[in-house]
Amino acid sequence: MLQHAPTLTRLVGELKKLPGIGERTALRLAFHLLKSPQNLGSLAEALTQVQERVCACSVCFALTEQNPCPICSGGRDSSVICVVETSQDMLALERSNAYHGSYHVLQGAISPLHGVNPDDLRIRELLMRIEQGKVEEVVIATNFTVEGETTALYLARQLKPLGIRVTRLAHGIPLGSDIEFVDPATVQWAMKGRSEL
């Protein structure tokens, strides 16, 4: 591609490793960065700082710069643990301002097709947290995908014998949507999960 510029070729190759970035977008980004050297320097500095400063919280395994993270060390309700797949999921829940307990980030979901087994996730650490503390409820907030559902079922089987309340995030028809436009699987889940008024 760029035989005369192996460094640029390497940059394009590294950018292509990012999710959603193909050859053309990587090339466009590389040339954009080269047009403004101050942006290139800022990006390089930010990447270096992230590599040096961001780590997994030793309690909940969320990405943080402070260990334990501000949520784990900030006096949140530790009797309820919300289990999520990723730090991004945790941030989405935090943005909603609907939950004020603690978290546990599994760092993935069970996916035999991709070689991810329960031992590859932070499930053992979750069980240890429950055994050590005064946990009354675990909210399973894994994604509503095949992998997320598999993980939720596995967690429920592991947690129920411990005598704590195990709940799952509700799922169904999104607020503000018309039923006629909702897919059949979502309508089925909504019917199964209906509640009394």
Curated annotation (Swiss-Prot):
Residues covered by the Toprim domain: 79-174
Record keyword Zinc-finger present: yes
InterPro entries for the chain: DNA_Rcmb_RecR, Rcmb_RecR, Rcmb_RecR_Znf, TOPRIM_dom, TOPRIM_RecR
Zinc finger (C4-type): 57-72
GO biological processes: DNA recombination; DNA repair
UniProt keyword Metal-binding, yes or no: yes
Gene Ontology molecular function terms on file: DNA binding; zinc ion binding
Keyword terms: DNA damage, DNA recombination, DNA repair, Metal-binding, Zinc, Zinc-finger
Pfam families assigned: RecR_C, RecR_HhH, RecR_ZnF, Toprim_4
HAMAP family, A to Z: RecR
Family: Belongs to the RecR family.
NCBIfam families: recR
Chain's role: May play a role in DNA repair. It seems to be involved in an RecBC-independent recombinational process of DNA repair. It may act with RecF and RecO.
Protein name per its UniProtKB record: Recombination protein RecR
The organism of origin for this protein: Trichlorobacter lovleyi (strain ATCC BAA-1151 / DSM 17278 / SZ)
Chain's gene name: recR
